[in-house]
């Protein structure tokens, strides 16, 4: 398509599976995400979900609403203390999550990220491990990688079978990363303790969801991190990216940095921004 007047696409958020990055590059269009703006609200939401899962907040809430006070001893919880967090993807959200959990007395966090060096992870206080070790070792597995051809279906039946029986899976990234059929089976058969899901393979979810009947699952309509501050910050970050381009600077969070080496883009940049 003719994109002679289009210089940039700013993606509100950090997931970019809906952006055809290669097509942007071919059309001499720079694409960028609002890197950093979503880190804290998503990380805070994950902390809340970790506590809600391990303390059986949903189940206990339902007990009281249903007049089942005497059944409370069925739901003995566990603390975050001495537990292990494993993150899949060690980007900004995962780093903020680790930072927020620093005072909770948890074990050293571990991460699976093939794009991160051991030295860089060590500076963050994180130990890099393989995916299988992370799944076997973690009490909480939190997904923070983008949905790509490489990560689609990354967590399937085989991977879920590696998790601890008292482990929890949290997905605030993209639904396609997790095989939902395999996850449902693992949850209903109590092969893992629970899950929290903010995203699904097919969205929007407008029909009753099968996970909704499970008391060991927390759900949100891809909005668990939506706050006033989030939308303020992603708007500011997107606008700042456009200002950076206008002032002949590269914005943060560029998805196709190679576009800056293309003669067509450079000429367009000069024509539009002077």
Question: Which role fits each region the language model picked out?
Answer:
Residues 1-5, 80, 103, 160-165, ...:
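Short, conserved loop/helix-junction motifs that constitute active-site signature segments
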Residues 74-165, 273-274:
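Rossmann-like dinucleotide/phosphate-binding beta-alpha-beta segment
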